[in-house]
A protein has these predicted regions:
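Short His-Asn-centered micro-motif
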Residues: 45-47, 66, 84-89
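Conserved acetyl-CoA binding element of GNAT-fold acetyltransferases
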Residues: 40-51
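Terminal substrate-recognition subdomain of acyl/acetyltransferases
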Residues: 1-40, 71-151
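Conserved acetyl-CoA-binding loop-helix of GNAT-fold acetyltransferases
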Residues: 49, 54-71
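A structural signal for well-ordered alpha-helical segments within the folded catalytic domains
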Residues: 42, 56, 60-64, 91, ...
Length: 151
Protein backbone atom coordinates (compact mmCIF):
# COMPACT_ATOMS: atom_id res chain seq x y z
CA UNK A 1 0.00 0.00 0.00
CA UNK A 2 2.76 2.50 0.92
CA UNK A 3 5.63 1.12 -1.19
CA UNK A 4 4.58 2.79 -4.47
CA UNK A 5 4.85 6.14 -2.70
CA UNK A 6 8.42 5.71 -1.41
CA UNK A 7 11.25 6.80 -3.70
CA UNK A 8 13.49 3.80 -2.87
CA UNK A 9 12.81 0.10 -3.41
CA UNK A 10 14.49 -1.58 -0.47
CA UNK A 11 14.13 -4.85 1.45
CA UNK A 12 12.45 -4.79 4.85
CA UNK A 13 14.62 -3.42 7.64
CA UNK A 14 16.18 -6.00 9.96
CA UNK A 15 14.76 -5.98 13.52
CA UNK A 16 12.40 -3.11 12.68
CA UNK A 17 9.03 -2.36 14.16
CA UNK A 18 6.52 -0.97 11.68
CA UNK A 19 3.96 1.73 12.46
CA UNK A 20 0.90 2.79 10.47
CA UNK A 21 -1.04 5.96 11.22
CA UNK A 22 -4.80 6.13 10.68
CA UNK A 23 -7.25 9.02 10.34
CA UNK A 24 -10.91 8.01 10.67
CA UNK A 25 -10.00 4.38 9.87
CA UNK A 26 -7.99 5.30 6.76
CA UNK A 27 -4.29 4.35 6.66
CA UNK A 28 -2.49 7.60 5.86
CA UNK A 29 1.16 7.16 6.92
CA UNK A 30 3.80 4.53 7.59
CA UNK A 31 7.23 4.39 9.21
CA UNK A 32 9.74 1.79 10.38
CA UNK A 33 11.97 2.05 13.45
CA UNK A 34 14.99 -0.17 14.10
CA UNK A 35 17.60 -0.34 16.87
CA UNK A 36 20.81 1.62 16.38
CA UNK A 37 22.12 0.66 19.79
CA UNK A 38 25.80 1.09 18.92
CA UNK A 39 25.11 4.83 19.31
CA UNK A 40 22.49 4.44 22.03
CA UNK A 41 19.60 5.15 19.74
CA UNK A 42 16.88 4.07 17.39
CA UNK A 43 16.68 4.73 13.65
CA UNK A 44 13.34 5.91 12.28
CA UNK A 45 13.06 5.78 8.52
CA UNK A 46 11.05 5.01 5.41
CA UNK A 47 8.29 7.37 6.39
CA UNK A 48 5.54 7.62 3.80
CA UNK A 49 2.53 9.91 3.93
CA UNK A 50 -0.13 9.22 1.33
CA UNK A 51 -0.17 12.00 -1.30
CA UNK A 52 -3.63 13.28 -0.42
CA UNK A 53 -2.46 13.84 3.19
CA UNK A 54 0.88 15.49 2.48
CA UNK A 55 1.19 19.06 3.70
CA UNK A 56 -1.55 18.67 6.32
CA UNK A 57 0.86 18.20 9.24
CA UNK A 58 -0.03 14.54 9.67
CA UNK A 59 3.52 13.39 8.90
CA UNK A 60 5.19 15.53 11.56
CA UNK A 61 2.66 14.57 14.22
CA UNK A 62 3.07 10.89 13.31
CA UNK A 63 6.88 11.13 13.28
CA UNK A 64 6.99 12.92 16.64
CA UNK A 65 4.65 10.45 18.31
CA UNK A 66 6.37 7.32 16.95
CA UNK A 67 9.76 8.70 17.97
CA UNK A 68 8.47 9.70 21.43
CA UNK A 69 7.29 6.10 21.91
CA UNK A 70 10.89 4.89 21.52
CA UNK A 71 11.65 6.35 24.97
CA UNK A 72 8.74 4.50 26.62
CA UNK A 73 7.81 0.91 27.49
CA UNK A 74 6.46 0.59 23.92
CA UNK A 75 10.09 -0.02 22.88
CA UNK A 76 11.83 -2.98 24.53
CA UNK A 77 15.16 -1.11 24.28
CA UNK A 78 13.79 2.12 25.82
CA UNK A 79 16.19 2.13 28.77
CA UNK A 80 19.18 2.11 26.39
CA UNK A 81 17.83 4.76 24.01
CA UNK A 82 19.30 8.25 24.33
CA UNK A 83 18.14 9.52 20.92
CA UNK A 84 16.14 8.71 17.80
CA UNK A 85 17.73 9.45 14.42
CA UNK A 86 15.83 10.27 11.23
CA UNK A 87 17.11 11.08 7.74
CA UNK A 88 15.10 12.58 4.91
CA UNK A 89 15.58 14.12 1.50
CA UNK A 90 12.20 15.89 1.47
CA UNK A 91 12.82 19.67 1.54
CA UNK A 92 9.50 20.48 3.25
CA UNK A 93 10.03 17.85 5.92
CA UNK A 94 13.60 19.10 6.50
CA UNK A 95 12.25 22.62 7.02
CA UNK A 96 9.56 21.36 9.42
CA UNK A 97 12.12 19.36 11.42
CA UNK A 98 14.39 22.42 11.71
CA UNK A 99 11.44 24.46 13.06
CA UNK A 100 10.47 21.81 15.63
CA UNK A 101 12.31 22.28 18.95
CA UNK A 102 12.27 18.50 19.56
CA UNK A 103 14.70 17.97 16.67
CA UNK A 104 18.31 19.00 16.05
CA UNK A 105 19.91 18.73 12.62
CA UNK A 106 23.07 16.64 12.89
CA UNK A 107 24.15 16.05 9.29
CA UNK A 108 23.62 16.85 5.65
CA UNK A 109 24.92 15.37 2.43
CA UNK A 110 23.97 17.59 -0.46
CA UNK A 111 24.78 15.07 -3.21
CA UNK A 112 25.12 11.31 -3.47
CA UNK A 113 28.22 9.30 -4.19
CA UNK A 114 28.67 6.53 -6.71
CA UNK A 115 28.27 3.24 -4.78
CA UNK A 116 29.99 1.14 -7.45
CA UNK A 117 33.01 3.46 -7.37
CA UNK A 118 33.15 3.24 -3.58
CA UNK A 119 33.06 -0.58 -3.68
CA UNK A 120 35.82 -0.63 -6.32
CA UNK A 121 37.99 1.73 -4.24
CA UNK A 122 37.51 -0.38 -1.10
CA UNK A 123 38.37 -3.59 -3.00
CA UNK A 124 41.61 -1.90 -4.11
CA UNK A 125 42.41 -1.16 -0.49
CA UNK A 126 41.78 2.56 -0.85
CA UNK A 127 39.87 4.31 1.86
CA UNK A 128 37.12 6.60 0.79
CA UNK A 129 36.01 9.78 2.46
CA UNK A 130 33.30 10.39 -0.11
CA UNK A 131 29.90 10.51 1.61
CA UNK A 132 27.22 8.19 0.36
CA UNK A 133 23.53 8.87 -0.12
CA UNK A 134 22.49 5.30 -0.78
CA UNK A 135 23.23 5.58 -4.50
CA UNK A 136 20.17 7.74 -5.16
CA UNK A 137 22.03 11.06 -5.55
CA UNK A 138 19.62 13.06 -3.40
CA UNK A 139 20.44 15.58 -0.73
CA UNK A 140 19.95 13.83 2.61
CA UNK A 141 19.71 15.60 5.95
CA UNK A 142 19.94 13.90 9.34
CA UNK A 143 18.09 14.85 12.51
CA UNK A 144 18.15 13.70 16.12
CA UNK A 145 15.47 13.73 18.82
CA UNK A 146 16.99 13.43 22.29
CA UNK A 147 15.22 11.77 25.19
CA UNK A 148 15.03 15.02 27.22
CA UNK A 149 13.19 16.81 24.39
CA UNK A 150 10.83 13.97 23.48
CA UNK A 151 8.43 14.31 26.40
Amino acid sequence: MFEPHHYLKLPRMVAAKYYVGFVDGEAVCHMAVAPKLEVGGMRACRMVVMPEWQGAGVGMRFLNEVCRLQFTDANKFHERVKAVYFHTSHPGLCAALRRDKKWAQVSQIMGGANKADQKRRLAQGKTTSVPSAGGHHRAVQGFKMQRALAV
